[in-house]
Amino acid sequence: MSGQQQATSVLVFFVNGKKVTDTNPDPECTLLTYLRDKLRLCGTKLGCAEGGCGACTVMISRMDRGQHKIRHLAVNACLTPVCAMHGCAVTTVEGIGSTRTRLHPVQERLAKAHGSQCGFCTPGIVMSMYALLRNAEQPSMRDLEVAFQGNLCRCTGYRPILEGYKTFTKEFLCGMGEKCCRVNGKGCGGGDDPESVTDDTLFERSKFQPLDASQEPIFPPELQLSNAYDSESLVFSSERVTWYRPTTLQELLQLKAAHPAAKLVVGNTEVGVEVKFKHFLYPHLINPTLVAELQEVRESEESIYFGAAVSLMEIDALLRQRIEELPEAQTRLFQCTVDMLHYFAGKQIRNVACLGGNIMTGSPISDMNPVLTAAGARLEVASIVEGKISQRTVHMGTGFFTGYRRNVIEPQEVLLGIHFQKTTPDQHVVAFKQARRRDDDIAIVNAAVNVRFEPKSNVVAEISMAFGGMAPTTVLAPRTSQLMVKQPLDHQLLERVAESLCGELPLAASAPGGMIAYRRALVVSLIFKAYLAISSKLSEAGIIAGDAIPPKERSGAELFHTPTLRSAQLFERVCSDQPVCDPIGRPEVHAAALKQATGEAIYTDDIPRMDGELYLGFVLSTKPRAKITKLDASAALALEGVHAFFSHKDLTVHENEVGPVFHDEHVFAAGEVHCYGQIVGAVAADNKALAQRASRLVRVEYEDLSPVIVTIEQAIEHGSYFPDYPRYVTKGNMAEAFAQAEHTYEGSCRMGGQEHFYLETHAAVAVPRDSDELELFCSTQHPSEVQKLVAHVTSLPAHRVVCRAKRLGGGFGGKESRGISVALPVALAAYRLRRPVRCMLDRDEDMLITGTRHPFLFKYKVAFSSDGLITACDIECYNNAGWSMDLSFSVLERAMYHFENCYHIPNVRVGGWVCKTNLPSNTAFRGFGGPQGMFAGEHIIRDVARIVGRDVLDVMRLNFYRTGDTTHYNQQLEHFPIERCLDDCLTQSRYHERRAEIAKFNRENRWRKRGVAVIPTKYGIAFGVMHLNQAGALLNVYGDGSVLLSHGGVEIGQGLNTKMIQCAARALGIPSELIHISETATDKVPNTSPTAASVGSDINGMAVLDACEKLNKRLAPIKEALPQATWQEWINKAYFDRVSLSATGFYAMPGIGYHPETNPNARTYSYYTNGVGISVVEIDCLTGDHQVLSTDIVMDIGSSINPAIDIGQIEGAFMQGYGLFTLEELMYSPQGMLYSRGPGMYKLPGFADIPGEFNVSLLTGAPNPRAVYSSKAVGEPPLFIGASAFFAIKEAIAAARQEHGLTGDFPLEAPSTSARIRMACQDKFTNLLEVPEAGSFTPWNIVP
């Protein structure tokens, strides 16, 4: 190493108080990999590998020598290099508490507040909260908001997490002290009224153990008392990469002179992503965080100087402090900066990322570069010239960025720091950012304006406007800026500015990133927001008249802020005489919640590595449709540690053909590939990194085939459908109904797909056993299918294959059939090599390979009367299946059976087409076609209401099904309480009051509008295929009275095991604590159905009851003889009397199996789950941003087995549906390549996206006679209520359009992204844009 100081190559750090010393650390290894693979601390999870989900969050503690304090930081272990941990203390979820010792209050409160479902995200959320409390023992709700910006949860809907952790905050305490309703656990809704039939207390806060800071683990004294590790220069080398950590500026600059192409790594938030996903190799990495000059902070009268390696959170903290202390006029750049930093990534990223890295990376969508460029920020750079340190000053502004991710700073130079100038009274700096999601998202477009006025006037003296997202670099608009100089800033000038910007900042129709019209509109819209914001300041200062900005327009400058959550959960109280040990109807904590909160819960990839285990890496297709002309794995096999390559050549044609129903798929592509991401082959190697590196060396040559079909419209054009389609369902006399109709209308609607984004990706471990047996541990919702197809691929009988699934980190249907993509190659490799083999897909692989929810297109013609009564509907349903059938036929059928939603239509013809395209095969997803079908139905009901001029609510009521009505598939509705749900929800939500409030708001605001929407739902409960409606159970009672229960369902996070324990506890009359469920395994319960279709509790619960009844029957004589004995005594007596204490249970759902020809009188569904949701939404008409202000839900779920779990399912389903209809957009190239392969581009709802007021009520007094203990299914039915946000948004857009003279209907596809919202709000700014003619260009992305 250059420089005079001797470097060390020994890595030393602490993990959970234990010292770790490594003499040969790998610079390419992340902290997450080190924790999991070397230290076997598997509580920390891999969710995305790009710092976007927070599942890998740990706390890093280090001694700040300058401040003489210990800093505790939540960080993403998936991005943090382990080499950067030298001299640090790492705390993981295992290090703060356990079920075997003592739970930490952070773990306890999350679990007992029902904030953990699948549990895969739970350790990361726990550690984000823990790190917050280590820095602020009593945080504010805003602190919580910030702490969780970098964490995602796909299951809970976030509400219970916030409710549990709210108990730590300042806002939670009130003047009532111990009598406060929030402390004593009684809630504020009168749940303690003994006369009430409802309860509102899901957990008792008063029983939480207090937070005691004195009990926290101490910072290692060795690190606190000595700076030896901080003063050491480091050099760590591997075969490919060398890591340097200099401690002086001289060393750093000498290193940069010796290695000009070396990457400086501070937070590794950009380089880590490049290395992981772009497979960049940087042979030299330099970590400059201990170079004093790069950590310097100094202040002067004119500015604050931050060293280039100072973290964004430290910059944010100091700037906020100065904003509080200094006059407002001096801190406008500071305020602008902290405003932008709030939306810069998540807290875990901001804790380690630095401003210098942001500048030097030069991303065209950087959040900070437009601010710094507009401000003309002064930078200090240094280099070694003739052995001496040479410094110079560089200004950000015109000419600083010289190209994509390039600037004027030379390769051998190092950025030392940035000056933040204080502003003057006549200077204003504002910035705005628009992204797909507000929190933790990259910008679509951002803009910053730095303007100085002539003294005490609104005449522009000088102005700089910078934009991100409009070119390969941050760009200025000098021509438009010059136009504004010496002009008063007013509406007239803004008209000219808007026109000028449209010309100065063009964007090619095929530009990367897509959304061309939207991005161009944002440029003008964001500048208009800046104008409104600055004019407001000028007005406040008395420089311009108070009415210079019309009152209706002032709110256009405002941004959405996350409100403090308000919520209520109401459910039916259990009878006062119900035995204490009877758990049915009680809000029991999820059976695995405490293990999940402590990191003790074991998921598939947490299973300890076995001796001789190999890892499987996949070779994936890089073509959408092509013939494979060459497949050469020789380069991969030449690598040391690579043991085998598998392809279709290793299987017979028959063995290679697989599929859940139709065997039209292949384990490995044979001859042709049909989509991007199809598995072509697999490499077995010693470890994951090597397997993946080797897989990239496999050479595949192709011959392109055509046509490539990606979209539904292309499939229709080419007639590309699966055989036997279209299919039709008919009812009544269509011709007569349309001939007699007073009105007819033809319309269409369309919605995109949705990525499952279970936090745990697909994973499998296969272990060969003796006697030609194979044991699989698999993240699957359908163990029996995996067993069957593994047996098929290996030509083994099924009894030699055992598939086990202990728990899944989420599934949502995505692990029902697609798990075979991973399990089959893993099983084959293990069987052939006779060694254990493992694979867990990376997030980008999982998203590319495993398919999504089906996109749908609907075309309909409807007949109706003048009062809105629908008399007939002719509808065509098209789904995009991808390249193989999978379950698409059944998804289509459910859409066809659900399109009418809650509305009775006497005459129906519904046709369905399964479109075959060159996309990965789409598959089951929560709702299974039902939400798509009901989406069409809600469009129809609103079209009818609009045409006849009646309120939608009135038309809904007019058309509602009533008890006794018959559906278009001949099922009579026996109990249909939709009107009761509606009435309760209208009252709960103050619907009519809110409508009046919305009307008033919309009259008073031009650029912000609100809408409200009511959504009813009717979801049929049963598998569409009759034979799947069955389940089995096995009950084993041991001599000590403990019970081991097995059933055919899989615990995915939905609380199935918890409910089964509750069912067995009531049936046996024993406490839940005596019952344990270990796993789901095909050698315990054979021939299981998938855990899907929301029937898991129904069919498995009845099987459990059957087993319990058999056991009870055997025990009955003993109980009669010993009526005063205990359960343990009865069991002991039974054992000695040689009574079998093992029982099997079985259940087959009765009365179903409808077929229009062979079984027309049977039911299609066992029953229906109904509900109603009402959402109020506000939109920003200038940006397309939106916020859900409130959501109220009333669900009829019969007699709830567990209200806490059921309400959690309702909230989680709503948020998933909300994501489907508003946020989650899959981006494909015109050739079918998926762009959105991780949380960086694919946005599911975050903590800040939940409704500001979120109320859920369970309908009381509505037992269901057709399911276990009078309950109803709850997993899928609430999802469609998320569409209430979509239709509320559409109502708000309509109000915006009316403001500009636009009436009538307008198209709005789902999801209603910010781009679609903004472009639907047509106005004077969007009218400035020229729209290129369709077909004159190739778009960057298309909608499948």
UniProtKB/Swiss-Prot annotation:
The keyword Transmembrane is annotated on this UniProt entry: no
EC number: 1.17.1.4
GO biological process, alphabetically ordered: xanthine catabolic process
Cofactor: how bound: Binds 1 Mo-molybdopterin (Mo-MPT) cofactor per subunit.
Chain ranges of the 2Fe-2S ferredoxin-type domain: 9-96
InterPro entries: 2Fe-2S-bd, 2Fe-2S-bd_dom_sf, 2Fe-2S_ferredoxin-like_sf, 2Fe-2S_ferredoxin-type, 2Fe2S_fd_BS, Ald_Oxase/Xan_DH_a/b, Ald_Oxase/Xan_DH_a/b_sf, Ald_Oxase/xanthine_DH-like
Swiss-Prot/TrEMBL catalytic activity: xanthine + NAD(+) + H2O = urate + NADH + H(+); hypoxanthine + NAD(+) + H2O = xanthine + NADH + H(+)
UniProt binding sites for Mo-molybdopterin: Q781, F812, R926, A1093
Cellular compartments annotated: Peroxisome
Domain FAD-binding PCMH-type: 236-425
One Gene Ontology MF term: iron ion binding
Binding site for FAD: 264-271, 344, 354-358, 367, 415, 433
Subunit structure and binding partners: Homodimer.
Family membership noted in the UniProt record: Belongs to the xanthine dehydrogenase family.
Name of protein: Xanthine dehydrogenase
Record lineage: Eukaryota, Metazoa, Ecdysozoa, Arthropoda, Hexapoda
Gene name, Swiss-Prot/TrEMBL: Xdh
